[in-house]
Amino acid sequence: YYPMEERCRTCYPSQDWRPIFQKSKLIIWLSTLHRESWLFSFSELTRHDYALVPSPVSPDDFYDMKLERKGAIAVDSGIDFKGKERFVEWCVEHKDTPVTLVGPGDNLPPNVTRIEHVLYTKLNEMYNKHEVFVHLPVNPMPFDRTVAEAYLAGCHVIGNPLVGALSWPEFSQGREAVKVLLEGSSNKFWEELEEVVS
């Protein structure tokens, strides 16, 4: 699967997924980028009913704890499609910045400390210990909730145009706007489904 690349107009999933999309009553996209990446391969979906509903992230779980912050953090950026090459380049360019990578990864620069796993209940505190959250994927990401979590936790986000969360205008309007967007996402999802099935 190569979203938004010419070779994906005929890639193997397209033949399986096209009828599923076409038969659906409603498509729920996690961001405008999520929708655009699929319309690239399935332009006929332009006319299909859809709703934009971001991933549910609880602002009660992610907030600024006013801790001392230092360096950068990334989650799963050691995975190729999540942007390992770009992440490593960023770390090399910022060799004096200590970087914490949560998740898999190998052959990392010396300024990167890797942690295999952080409990969900400890993620907010982990974000709060860092100034910057780095996420530079190579494929369009439907949303990437870690971006929203880190942003709500007070991190400055270093992203790129392939991060679905950042395609929401609220991310350029400030944390309060993002908080309002996300705290209603679970309800919006169920409201959209109820409208379709009723």
Spans of features found by a protein language model:
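Membrane-proximal helix-turn-helix segments that form the acceptor-binding/catalytic region
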Residues: 2-27, 128
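Donor nucleotide-sugar binding/catalytic pocket of nucleotide-sugar-dependent glycosyltransferases
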Residues: 22-63
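Short, well-ordered alpha-helix to beta-strand connector turns
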Residues: 23-26, 69, 111, 130, ...
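Conserved catalytic-core segment of nucleotide-activated headgroup transferases in glycan assembly
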Residues: 56-120
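Short alpha-helical segment that forms part of, or immediately flanks, the ligand-binding pocket
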Residues: 124, 147-152
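A charged, aromatic-enriched C-terminal amphipathic alpha-helix characteristic of glycosyltransferases
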Residues: 171-198
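Nucleotide-sugar-dependent
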Residues: 137-146, 161-162, 166-168
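Acidic donor-binding loop of glycosyltransferase active sites
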Residues: 128-142, 155
